[in-house]
Amino acid sequence: MTVTSGFSQYVENACLNWFRGTTFPAVPANLYLALFTTAPVNGVDSAAVEVSGGSYARKSFVPNTTNFGAPSGAAPASSILGANQVFITPTGSWGTVAGWAMYDASSAGNMLAYGIFTPVAVGSGDTVEFLSGNLTLSVA
C-alpha cells in the first residue's frame, strides 16, 4: 500500500511559532492512528469523515524509537513506522477507507500528520494494519 502523507496545520503552526520563541508542544504520552472514509485535506480535519461504528477506535501507540525510526536522508528527511500497528477487528462495516491521520488524543484532539492511500472496503472481521516500513513521514 502506498501512503502519501503530510503534517497538519497544527504541527506546521507549532514549528513556525517556535521560531517566534514560543514553546513547542510537549510529546504526548500516546499517539493515535485514525482512519477516514473521506480523507483530511491540506492538514485540516474539518472536511474529513472518520470511520465510526463496528467497534472502531483509534489505534494507540507510544511515541518512541521502536515505533518510529530516527530521521534520515535529505530532501526529504523522513521517519519510518518501525512496528506494525493493528486496529481492533471490525464487528461491522467501516465503509471504504481512504485516509488516515495521527492525533494526540483517542478522540478529538490535535491532528499531527495525515495521509491518503488507495481506498479499500473494510468489512466485519477484516484485519486493518499499518505494517512496519509502510508509513513514512517526510519533511521536504
Regions found by a protein language model. Name each.
Residues 1-100, 104-140:
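Small cysteine-rich, disulfide-bonded extracellular modules of the LU/uPAR three-finger superfamily
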